[in-house]
Amino acid sequence: MFARQTLRAAQPFRSQYRRYATESSSSGSNTALYTGVAAAVAGAGYYFMSQGDNAAKVKDAAKDAEAKAKEALGQGQAKVEGAVGKAAFTGGDQGFISLKLDSVELVNHNTKKFRFELPESDQVSGLHVTSALITKYKGPEMQKPAIRPYTPTSDEGEKGFIDLLVKKYPNGVMSEHMHEMVPGQRLDFKGPIPKYAWSANKHDHIALIAGGTGITPMYQLARAIFNNPADKTKVTLVFANVTEEDILLKREFEDLENTYPQRFRAFYVLDNPPKSWKGGKGFINKELLKTVLPEPKSENIKLFVCGPPGMYKAISGGKVSPSDQGELAGILKELGYSKDQVYKF
């Protein structure tokens, strides 16, 4: 796979990057439930016809079939609700919820993985794909609380906890506070904060252009796509970091690459690579993006960008506000992409 190969000259490989084979479709359903309901109704219909003018028996059979159908549908609905679970975060006027820190795992020299317990063990977070949570912390000498958004890396269907990957930034009030936290302490959360509404096969091909911890919503989206057998979206990841050690979730992306080599490809770029590095060097540039991204004239594509301010400026231009995507600028505009083909997290 190309993500482990040297980035060679762009042109000879362009056609290779553009090609993806189609995989067979498979998806789960409630077939057994609906078949049972249909059988009950069909059986009653047959009984009606076979009994002629026996009105009392026909009426009793109809009631029995209706009751069985309702019971089957009720059981199916309960099964679905049980699988989804109760939501810890419901948005609206819910306000902040205090969550207890369960565990802390050192990921690299400046990043930790934090697992917070949800209020109840059978609850799910309530987040949808590409949504985030707001954290709040007010220290004893702080006049105003620090408010920061984070995208959980735990699966939306996981019950009882959420996971966050947090990089410690110099003078970053929230990240410094979290890196000092120990299990048993608490932090306030609120959400969910919706971003880009995703549904299976919404786009034929998407590209994820990320820098640093901007990878978290990208991972959330890629995981949802490949966890859904019905979703056949093709995914290209371009991920920039300072050093190889800074590449977060690389093992998870390598697993996707190994499992779906015809639908998922990853390209890594390092500002300070080791001598043995065979990937991209420096910054994400126009030549690389022109080579690996779906062409601007392609139908039904979407490009997602998430990273530090300097990356936004160079790649796509920044957002005006959380609700205003702003105009498209930078390399993506130069390559001919339109504003509606790009989403900035």
From Swiss-Prot:
Keyword Iron-sulfur on entry: no
GO molecular function: cytochrome-b5 reductase activity, acting on NAD(P)H
Taxonomy of the source species: Eukaryota, Fungi, Dikarya, Ascomycota, Pezizomycotina
InterPro entries: CBR-like, Cbr1-like_FAD-bd_dom, FAD-bd_FR_type, Flavoprot_Pyr_Nucl_cyt_Rdtase, FNR_nucleotide-bd, OxRdtase_FAD/NAD-bd, Riboflavin_synthase-like_b-brl
One GO term of the biological process aspect: ergosterol biosynthetic process
CDD domains: cyt_b5_reduct_like
Catalysed reaction, written as an equation: 2 Fe(III)-[cytochrome b5] + NADH = 2 Fe(II)-[cytochrome b5] + NAD(+) + H(+)
GO CC annotation terms, alphabetical: mitochondrial outer membrane
KW Calcium (keyword) present: no
FAD-binding FR-type domain mapped to chain residues: 94-199
Pfam families per UniProt: FAD_binding_6 (PF00970), NAD_binding_1 (PF00175)
Record EC number: 1.6.2.2
Cofactors required: FAD
Keywords per UniProt: FAD, Flavoprotein, Membrane, Mitochondrion, Mitochondrion outer membrane, NAD, Oxidoreductase, Transmembrane, Transmembrane helix
Native species: Sclerotinia sclerotiorum (strain ATCC 18683 / 1980 / Ss-1)
PANTHER family in the cross-refs: NADH-CYTOCHROME B5 REDUCTASE, NADH-CYTOCHROME B5 REDUCTASE 2
Membrane topology (UniProt): Single-pass membrane protein
Known role: May mediate the reduction of outer membrane cytochrome b5.
Transmembrane segments: 31-47
Protein family: Belongs to the flavoprotein pyridine nucleotide cytochrome reductase family.
Top-level lineage group: Eukaryota
Name the UniProt record assigns to this protein: NADH-cytochrome b5 reductase 2
Subcellular location: Mitochondrion outer membrane
